[in-house]
Design a protein with these regions (language model features):
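Acidic/aromatic-lined carbohydrate-recognition and catalytic surfaces
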Residues: 3-149
């Protein structure tokens, strides 16, 4: 009886894509604002944050047409957190801060050199070696390289 009551309890939640978070890089990221948002939800008794898929998007930037069900879209990586982790030499400048719409192509172009720098520094870590041992990573990397060629 107690289990049935617990299962029937309602929870409060919100649906908001990560891309809608405030940002200084043109798209919401999984960075400081995301942590602040989750803390605000917790303080207000909201227990569920439903987001749109975070996978690498295909045609039309639709989150429902991803290139992979395992990989995450690099557009949501926080450049500030990469800097704080020591993976970037300098903090990235502000780019399209808190805009109302996302120019995905412009954001990708802006972030690419910083993500490449962070990647080159990350490849020397044990975390990277552990990540690349996951079975899907090699096949996905080959797929993306061929797609880009």
């Amino acid at each position: 009886m107690q289990q049935e009551r617990k299962a029937a309890m309602r929870e409060t939640g919100i649906l908001m894509p990560v891309s809608a978070l405030p940002s200084r890089t043109g798209v919401g990221e999984l960075g400081a604002y995301a942590y602040e948002f989750v803390e605000a939800l917790r303080e207000n008794g909201v227990k569920i944050w439903q987001i749109l898929p975070l996978n690498p998007v295909g045609y039309g930037n639709s989150p429902y047409q991803p290139y992979s069900s395992c990989a995450g879209d690099e557009i949501y990586i926080s450049l500030d957190l990469l800097f704080e982790a020591g993976l970037l030499k300098e903090q990235a400048p502000t780019f399209h801060e808190n805009v109302r719409t996302v120019d995905y192509d412009a954001v990708r172009t802006f972030k690419e050199p910083y993500l490449k720098e962070a990647f080159s520094n990350f490849t020397e870590t044990e975390d990277f070696r552990e990540f690349t041992r996951q079975p899907w990573v090699y096949e996905y990397a080959v797929f993306r390289a061929k797609k880009k060629a």
